[in-house]
Amino acid sequence: MGKEKAHVNVVVIGHVDSGKSTTTGHLIYKCGGIDKRTIEKFEKEAAELGKGSFKYAWVLDKLKAERERGITIDIALWKSETPKYMVTVIDAPGHRDFIKNMITGTSQADCAILIIAGGTGEFEAGISKDGQTREHALLAFTLGVRQLIVAVNKMDTTNWSEARFNEIVKETSNFIKKVGYNPKTVAFVPISGWHGDNMLEPSTNMPWYKGWSKEVKGSSSPATGKTLVDAIDAIEPPVRPSDKPLRLPLQDVYKIGGIGTVPVGRVETGIIKPGMVVSFAPSNVTTEVKSVEMHHEQLAEGLPGDNVGFNVKNVSVKDIRRGDVASDSKNDPAKEAASFNAQVIVLNHPGQIGAGYAPVLDCHTAHIACKFSELIEKIDRRTGKTMEAAPKFVKSGDAAIVKLVPSKPMCVESYNEYPPLGRFAVRDMRQTVAVGVIKSVEKTEGKGGKVTKSAEKAAKKK
């Protein structure tokens, strides 16, 4: 086996018709996410349905349909392998809750792949003012996804035109610069997700294309390559935050006969291990971790990115709930937030938002109404400079620093300290109306806490 490859998470963004499903499907199909048996089954069905040409997008549709029917698809289907990395495609595009998922995200993306349709008229529609592409790119940037790859798709429909590719690179560079990316650090790859050109192998249809090159932090020589897979391999590896204090937002709490209470969630930062005394915020319960397991196997420790279940003693299912955050009681334990200040970007709200507005916030696994108690300042989205102090209201397209007060106990953190607990989506009218990044949190001890016997014993042992 050798050493396991490093993992990277990519999110694929772009306009509905950019061909991102086909491209993602092709990547997963060719790079090993889907086992041969499943492919044969799909191909047979495709042939029977007269989709004999077998569209890669159809693979993705099948996976998505199964996922939406609530059949949990083995997440490996969304994985593919490149020479250097194990790649997980975080959320297949076109998914209804795409924006919410990106924020409360099952995991933070290390890189975004922006798929642009090269066809005449298509490109222009994709990045027009109200375009989805713009919203997705803005979202990725706001949420701290700093690495970007641009794939110019459907080159086959442009007769593999170099002039068209160059025109799109120029326009897209301006476009992503406005969002906040530096085009010099971005690989631009002309592809056909349908025919496979420049996906894994250099295309013979575009002899004019000499490859991409991008600046790399801390290196005087640029990174270069030919294909989309090369570009994925040139992603700078992420640093996983295992040296930070523990933060583990609960997704569920189970009661398991003969074992007891088992909270389940993803380790976002730090490490959880048996014997540790954890406290849950904002529930204010402290207890000892008896065991940690993942996929029904006991673990010596759970690391960032691991989805774990852990058994806690003397805590009932009524004491803790989804949205609570587990942390190490001896190392910067998590606390309830009395209020917090955040930079909010309004994406699509039909009216104007003023003080008193109280939508639902989705932050990590918490889903709680919060009141905009004060609009502190309106700022320039790109530079962060103040444009107006104490504005009366903000509207779509605006960025502002606001003070938020949760309607029920809630635990959040500043984005700088604990990124996964410091970004949120503002939901109203069944859509995401704004996204935010938390600047600072005013913490409170909350109501009287419960410390279990086992926690006291464990503390004495230490």
UniProtKB/Swiss-Prot annotation:
This protein promotes the GTP-dependent binding of aminoacyl-tRNA to the A-site of ribosomes during protein biosynthesis. The keyword Cytoplasm applies. Keywords: Cytoplasm, Elongation factor, GTP-binding, Methylation, Nucleotide-binding, Protein biosynthesis. The modification N6-methyllysine is found at K3, K30, K318, K392. Its main location: cytoplasm. The modification N6,N6,N6-trimethyllysine is found at K79. Coiled coil: none annotated. Gene3D superfamilies: P-loop containing nucleotide triphosphate hydrolases, Translation factors. Pfam families: GTP-eEF1A_C, GTP_EFTU, GTP_EFTU_D2. The lineage of its organism: Eukaryota, Fungi, Dikarya, Basidiomycota, Agaricomycotina. Residues 70-74 are annotated as: G2. It comes from Serendipita indica. This is Elongation factor 1-alpha. Residues 153-156 are annotated as: G4.
